[in-house]
Regions:
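A short beta-loop-alpha structural element at the N-terminal edge
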Residues: 1-16, 175-187
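A conserved beta-strand-loop-helix scaffold within acyl/acetyltransferase catalytic domains
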Residues: 19, 23-48, 61-78, 195-260
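A structural microfeature
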Residues: 61, 150-152, 227, 310
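Conserved hydrophobic beta-strand within the GNAT/NAT acetyltransferase core sheet
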Residues: 83, 117-120, 256, 290-293
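Conserved acetyl-CoA-binding loop-helix of GNAT-fold acetyltransferases
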Residues: 88, 94-111, 257-261, 267-280, ...
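Acyl-donor-binding surface of acyltransferase catalytic domains
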Residues: 103-172, 315-317
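Short hairpin/turn module used for nucleic-acid contact or packing/dimerization
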Residues: 267, 273-320
């Protein structure tokens, strides 16, 4: 077995390997793999490797390690590293390939000062944990010193077989509306005040990638933004997490979330209402399948007809 440094010339072959192993559940697109695993500035090149069969010269496994490396005023995961993905072909398992890839990733993360490694949950992640049905994968990582953490995370699915033209909900003393490019500064100020961290980071990237605002429904009270809901579809400026697996749906996929309401205005039903507003906006674009990703609030969203579609077990490992 040969181990070669992370190199985007292998992107198509790695995408093919992924789909060979996971494509029925999590169909990969080369565009998505390049976006999340090659273009992300947080990829640790010294910890990301490709296992290549010495005879066929085809990739049979790979690992992607990340830690925070961006030069922004915010930081995600101080002291945290991530294994974005570790995949070995079924035919090459049980030969130590996975252990070698993981060791290389962990050693590089240690050298970056990482104190704890999480599986998934990285910037530009694929998964918030190990797909819960993958019992053998969970057992393998447990043997490597990883421990299950907290509750299962869920991707939820809502489906609307009948097309509809709907009106945005009404709110006393305010309104729901789509964001515009001119709202960028006010929206980022709101997020920095109310939701600093990952959601703020994702919106910074959204506008940097040419976002126009159409991916956000906001609620305004007395002219001030007090809540938001992100919505994604095939026309978004990059592939967002709740539409990663759109190829599973012949008639397309939309996504809702994240969402949040200023703490001062909670308890008024605005959270559920802004989700409804996001759903209305997507349905008016002709979208009949909608995913809400990475949540434990299954009962909350069940009120809108959403059910758990995929589940993920969160795992981490603290370096001693």
């Amino acid at each position: 077995m040969q181990y070669v440094s992370w190199d985007d010339q292998y992107a198509d072959a790695l995408c093919e390997l992924w789909n060979q192993e996971l494509g029925d559940r999590f169909p990969m697109r080369t565009e998505l793999m390049r976006q999340n695993s090659f273009e992300d500035q947080n990829v640790v090149k010294a910890g990301s490797w490709i296992a290549v069969d010495a005879v066929t010269q085809r990739p049979v496994g790979f690992v992607v390690a990340k830690c925070w490396q961006e030069r922004l005023d915010i930081q995600l995961g101080k002291g945290i590293g991530w294994i974005q993905v570790l995949l070995v072909s079924t035919a090459h398992r049980g030969q130590g390939v996975g252990r070698e890839l993981l060791a290389r990733a962990e050693n590089a993360l240690r050298e970056q000062g990482v104190e704890k490694v999480l599986l998934g949950r990285d910037p530009y992640h694929y998964f918030p944990g190990i797909p819960d049905e993958s019992a053998e994968v969970k057992a393998w990582f447990e043997r490597q010193g990883y421990h299950s953490e907290d509750r299962l995370e869920n991707d939820l699915l809502g489906q609307y077989p009948e097309p509809a033209e709907l009106e945005l909900p009404e709110v006393p003393d305010g309104r729901f509306r789509l964001l515009t490019r001119e709202d960028e500064d006010a929206f980022l100020t709101f997020l920095h005040r109310c939701f600093p961290g990952r959601w703020e980071y994702e919106v910074i990237h959204y506008f940097q990638r040419g976002g126009t605002g159409r991916e956000f429904v906001v609620v305004e009270l007395h002219g001030e933004i007090v809540g938001f809901c992100r919505i994604n579809d095939a026309n978004s400026p990059f592939i967002a997490q709740n539409v990663y697996w759109a190829p599973l749906f012949a008639d397309g996929l939309g996504g809702v979330g994240p969402l949040g309401v200023d703490a001062e205005y909670r308890g008024r039903g605005l959270g559920l209402a802004i989700v409804e507003a996001g759903i209305v906006a997507l349905r008016n674009r002709g979208i009949s399948n909608i995913v809400i990703d990475w949540t434990t609030l299954v009962d909350f969203y069940a009120r809108l007809g959403y059910r758990s579609w995929k589940q993920y077990a969160k795992y981490g490992k603290t370096f001693s």
